Amino acid sequence: MRREWVAKRQGHANVSQMHYARQGIITEEMDYVAKRENLPAELIRDEVARGRMIIPANINHLNLEPMAIGIASKCKVNANIGASPNSSNLEEEVAKLNLAVKYGADTVMDLSTGGGNLDQIRTAIINASPVPIGTVPIYQALESVHGTIEKLTPDDFLHVIEKHAQQGVDYMTIHAGILIEYLPLVRNRITGIVSRGGGIIARWMLHHHKQNPLYTHFRDIIEIFKKYDVSFSLGDSLRPGCQHDASDEAQLSELKTLGQLTRKAWEHNVQVMVEGPGHVPMDQIEFNVRKQMEECSEAPFYVLGPLVTDIAPGYDHITSAIGAALAGWYGTAMLCYVTPKEHLGLPNAEDVRNGLIAYKIAAHAADIARHRPGARDRDDELSKARYNFDWNRQFELALDPDRAREYHDETLPADIYKTAEFCSMCGPKFCPMQTKVDADALTELEKFLAKQPTGTSV
């Protein structure tokens, strides 16, 4: 779809959506997004130009269907997939991608750390994906030195980053905000550093006693991203890994640096979103969202959860969806899903499904709460179908039609029950929705009530 769009930009030194938006140009991607979001194209251009919205769209990801991440657009959901040295392979990861897209993932991150040739896995995922693909290039950089963190050089990072950009990655997590002077701030934490990429950079700095190479070479990364229109997803290496550590000095110090890096990227017309926690008590979620907006000049916020309690391994898609709904309501632009396997193991296909549906619920609830245009239309349609006992229409409108049909058919599987005016909860005699009050009956009742003395009490 994008081949002709991209061809017109050949030879441009900067091909980012922000670059064109700031020239007053509405790109084909912006126009496509405007139609998807039911928003004016000029509004999309303006939001991208000011940095409050991004359209992750690498010029080499030609089968991409452009989408937007920003407070003016619908709240989005990211799904993480990826092979590990101990589990999964290329075929399984492509299957997870297809499943994630089926259940509504707006973007997908390939977090592969092993399980085969990482370049082949990544390329297969990009070629199969209509949604933006994100990566964490530091993982492959570490693989390139056979896992010996101390051997990593700035050139190792830059080489892998450029390779990912050439392959068509739309956004990359860059852990440039964790500075050497922030490491002592984790001393009093319960869980220390819980970001994989952040942990790699921390160990490198502790060994070499040098500043974060992703920070010192940030301008070099900007130059790569300009050439391919890769968006920054600035990693929160010092995000809290438990309730105790939330909103501490380490987290907020890094956040200030992420804001500085955001504005540095904007100086060169490169798109940015900023990653956030993590594990946060419910009463601190609004503060975290507002603080990010303040420090990062309203760049889109992209949070992992956050989990609102730490005592539910196996159910962290629920503990985190609670926090995600609140974060979305307060203005977070994209939610990174958490699966039931979080903290326990690599998610399988069913875990991906359960995590995604939990997060689609959270994002949709946030859209309704923020009164986004048309956000409640589907709810109203499903409610009408429910009131009219149109079971097939209810299944069709559900976030997970297969699950809705499966649960209904567990007890009433025959086709005749698809038109029945009850389900197995209430049975044929006790369903309150069978009480149809027509307009004539209400008119008669109103006439009767009008004749009654005022102030009548029982």
From Swiss-Prot:
Pathway: Cofactor biosynthesis; thiamine diphosphate biosynthesis
Record-level GO cellular component terms: cytosol
Catalytic activity, EC: 4.1.99.17
EC top class named in words: lyase
Residues reported to bind Zn(2+): H279, H343
Positions of transmembrane segments: none
Keyword 4Fe-4S in annotation: yes
Protein name per Swiss-Prot or TrEMBL: Phosphomethylpyrimidine synthase
Lineage of source species: Bacteria, Bacillati, Cyanobacteriota, Cyanophyceae, Gomontiellales
